[in-house]
């Protein structure tokens, strides 16, 4: 499968599939119509298990298009419900690792209100937006790079 090169499967069973999403691939279809993770994984499941018709795949969390990382998809509606509940109850924690060209402070918390421009599919700071909290801690510093 040609698009299978866009993902690496870390874990798979009858209930979930855990993959690495590469940078610059949308999680779901957007205005660009570029191939997205949901479609890629559905095609993979359909081909691997010789499934006729539509394949169920539950999207329980997202990563922004520019971001790469580990994603968990539900293969059943029951798994989707349970994963969504765990996320809602904060039993699942998201962690991001970033590499920056600039040195960062040792520890900082940034709080902003973000709104989304649907036409450009971008977010911006706005008084009427949804609260967004970013907390980071610098873990190392190597030459010109810093890893918060």
Regions found by a protein language model. Give the residues of each.
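RNA pseudouridine synthases
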Residues: 1-148
């Amino acid at each position: 499968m040609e698009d299978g090169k866009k993902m690496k499967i870390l874990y798979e069973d009858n209930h979930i599939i855990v993959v690495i999403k590469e940078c610059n691939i949308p999680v779901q279809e957007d205005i660009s119509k570029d191939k997205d993770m949901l479609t890629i994984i559905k095609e993979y499941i359909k081909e691997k298990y010789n499934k006729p018709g539509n394949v169920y795949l539950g999207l329980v969390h997202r990563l922004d298009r520019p971001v790469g990382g580990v994603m968990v998809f539900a293969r059943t509606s029951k798994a989707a419900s349970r994963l969504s509940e765990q996320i809602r109850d904060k039993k699942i924690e998201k962690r991001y690792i970033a590499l920056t060209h600039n040195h960062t402070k040792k520890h900082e918390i940034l709080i902003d209100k973000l709104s989304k421009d649907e036409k450009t599919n971008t977010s911006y700071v706005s008084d009427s937006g949804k609260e967004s909290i970013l907390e980071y801690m610098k873990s190392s510093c190597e030459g010109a790079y810093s890893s918060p």
